[in-house]
Amino acid sequence: MFHQIWAALLYFYGIILNSIYQCPEHSQLTTLGVDGKEFPEVHLGQWYFIAGAAPTKEELATFDPVDNIIFNMAAGSAPTQLHLRATIRMKDGLCVPRKWIYHLTEGSTDLRTEGRPDMKTELFSSSCPGGIMLNETGQGYQRFLFYNRSPHPPEKCVEEFKSLTSCLDSKAFLLTPRNQEACELSSN
């Protein structure tokens, strides 16, 4: 009898706790309108890297020396290509340019990075105005990345990203400082 009462109390405690700290289901993450045939124009243009989350700090270590990153996404020469240019402002003030090409996977929402066959990127919508979330997985890592059209989105957007990724087993969180002026994106 005692065990049944104890089990019932724990059950109700679990229900109450779950109602207070609700985490969205994986299915509530909405993949963006990538149909595997061409990349929607609404996602092209300039983006700022705001925050990252991952199960461990090591999976975010590549962003530790970064102050800010600005990206430009452009349609590639084929409808299934996406050209990405970035300029990374390091905390020491240096500007580091980067380029890479994503390939849309037909029949999927996955993006594959040219030259990195182990890497998969999925795009998700964000309830934050001008926001987008990526889930990158590769050999030995998984991380969520939050981007916005503004270099300084509302704080509630960052908190929402942190809360959501925490529910998805991300224990480490990184917020880019964005204290320095962004580097200029090169045109080539």
From Swiss-Prot:
Residues with glycosylation annotation: N135
Keyword annotations from UniProtKB, A to Z: Disulfide bond, Glycoprotein, HDL, Lipid transport, Secreted, Signal, Transport
Disulfide linkage: C23-C167, C95-C183, C128-C157
Compartmental location: Secreted
Annotated Gene Ontology cellular component terms: high-density lipoprotein particle; low-density lipoprotein particle; very-low-density lipoprotein particle
Keyword Acetylation: no
CDD domains, per the entry: lipocalin_ApoM
Signal peptide (UniProt feature, chain positions): 1-22
UniProt: tetradecanoate binding residues: E136, R143
Main subcellular localisation: secreted
One Gene Ontology term from the biological process aspect of the record: high-density lipoprotein particle remodeling
GO MF annotations, alphabetized: lipid transporter activity; phospholipid binding
Coiled coil location: none
This protein's record includes keyword rRNA-binding: no
Subunit relationships: Interacts with LRP2; LRP2 mediates APOM renal uptake and subsequent lysosomal degradation.
Function: Probably involved in lipid transport. Can bind sphingosine-1-phosphate, myristic acid, palmitic acid and stearic acid, retinol, all-trans-retinoic acid and 9-cis-retinoic acid.
Family: Belongs to the calycin superfamily. Lipocalin family. Highly divergent.
Protein name in UniProt: Apolipoprotein M
Organism: Pongo abelii (Sumatran orangutan)
Lineage: Eukaryota, Metazoa, Chordata, Craniata, Vertebrata
Gene expressing this chain: APOM
